[in-house]
Amino acid sequence: XTAVQTLDISPVGRVEGDLDSXSILEYFRNAILARFGGGLGKYAPFTGTNYEIGVTISGDKDPQAGLVVTPRESTTXGLNEPFYIKPYVSXGYIPHEDGALAHXIEVDGVVVEAYTQAELFR
């Protein structure tokens, strides 16, 4: 049995208005690398007040390449939603059948796919 390591990097705070994706991804990327390093091959779940991230860190693969940004239900009024960051494994991750791709954004030349909450949580 593999031990699961958890690192609390709260508080991240809420993201209201325009999502500064580059800053958030860089924050999580740095937190992952600082805690686990780049070659440990760990699956490292990170949780914060409004965000989660889980990426497989192996060899020279950049953790940023394994992220999905997903909308989270907001308890505040308005059109802007806070966001979750959840794992995305390009070699085999399949969204729920009843879900549809919401949109895609590009962060530093990397396309980060955004899915609705219903697609990742049933």
From Swiss-Prot:
Q: A single GO molecular function, which one?
A: cytochrome-c3 hydrogenase activity
Reaction equations catalysed: 2 Fe(III)-[cytochrome c3] + H2 = 2 Fe(II)-[cytochrome c3] + 2 H(+)
**Enzyme Commission number(s):** 1.12.2.1
Q: What is this protein called?
A: Cytochrome c3 hydrogenase large chain
The protein's UniProt keywords, in alphabetical order, are: Iron, Oxidoreductase
Q: Which organism is it from?
A: Acidithiobacillus ferrooxidans
> What cofactor does its activity depend on?
Fe cation
